[in-house]
Amino acid sequence: MIKISIDAMGGDFGPEVVIPGAAKAFERHPDIRFIFFGLPAQVEPVLARYPKLKEASEFRASEVAIGMDDKPSQALRAGRGKSSMWQAIEAVKTGDADACVSAGNTGALMAMSKFCLRMMSDVERPAIAGIWPTLRGESIVLDIGATIGADARQLVDYAVMGAGIARALFEVRKPTVGLLNVGTEEVKGLDEIKEAGQILRDTPLDGLEYSGFVEGNDIGKGTVDVVVTEGFTGNIALKTAEGTARQMAELLRQAMSRTLLAKIGYVFAKGAFDRLREKMDPNKVNGGVFLGLSGIVIKSHGGANAEGFCSAVEVGYDMVRNRLLEKIEADLAHFHHSHSHVSSKA
């Protein structure tokens, strides 16, 4: 049995999407047991529509719902101990739940997670890892917005943690890892990126294969399994990709509706367009993982539909099932030991 705590008030639509999404996950994985946190007047009527889910779940009342526009400091002051978001995270800390899933305010969720769960030993900064659709399948990109800036040591920690997720979600024994840079040549880029590359080249690692620097256009190609960057650049890359996908969809729609011949062509090509739309649908790869914390927290996109929220729950489910947290901690400890040994010999 895998226990997952849910911030039922999170996201643009709250319980109206969160609970149906959880119901979909329960249909696919009957060994999940949910603990829902939220305002009774809004959660209980929706939960009542899913009797099987309700019977296999627990509901705990909250006093406060964190708004999508609340500042992290404001959310901490108003929501600590009594908001659905805090209580869902705290359930992981107390051991009531194995993982937490929320579609709520990203800044507030990260602030509360850091405050409540604390960081892993020897990890200085958290990162958000996202699943990215590529020409070859999917890849992991991190950090996509947890913190701005990162030094070489932090970038290397991201590489180790990202490789751990790739092994669990993609079932790859030794994921390839690249550092996002302005060019693939070793002399290019900021000092911290070049230093991180040097560390990854010099330190023996069983759990990943360092492939050098990658450029922005390599992300969508699927050149590597894991792309590592700091949060400012990663978030811009994410928003650019999302905007480009929407732009392409709109341009295709306009082109296919412009003339009668185009409309006829669309009828014959509809299957291909449907497959493309499904490939680019953010709901199919929803679920950002907060890495570096001493517990599992999954961030669903705030505008996700029920299928999208279900995908986020499944990411948490897979992480627990694969004991990913313990493996990442072991990988980090092994890396830090190996790196210190290499550094002392140098």
Swiss-Prot record:
Family from the record: Belongs to the PlsX family.
Annotated EC: 2.3.1.274
GO molecular function, one term: phosphate:acyl-[acyl carrier protein] acyltransferase activity
Gene3D superfamilies: Isopropylmalate Dehydrogenase
UniProt GO cellular component terms: cytoplasm
GO biological process: fatty acid biosynthetic process; phospholipid biosynthetic process
Pathway: Lipid metabolism; phospholipid metabolism
Subcellular location as annotated: Cytoplasm
Subunit structure: Homodimer. Probably interacts with PlsY.
Record's keyword terms, sorted: Cytoplasm, Lipid biosynthesis, Lipid metabolism, Phospholipid biosynthesis, Phospholipid metabolism, Transferase
NCBIfam families according to UniProt: plsX
Annotated disulfide bonds: none
Protein name in UniProt: Phosphate acyltransferase
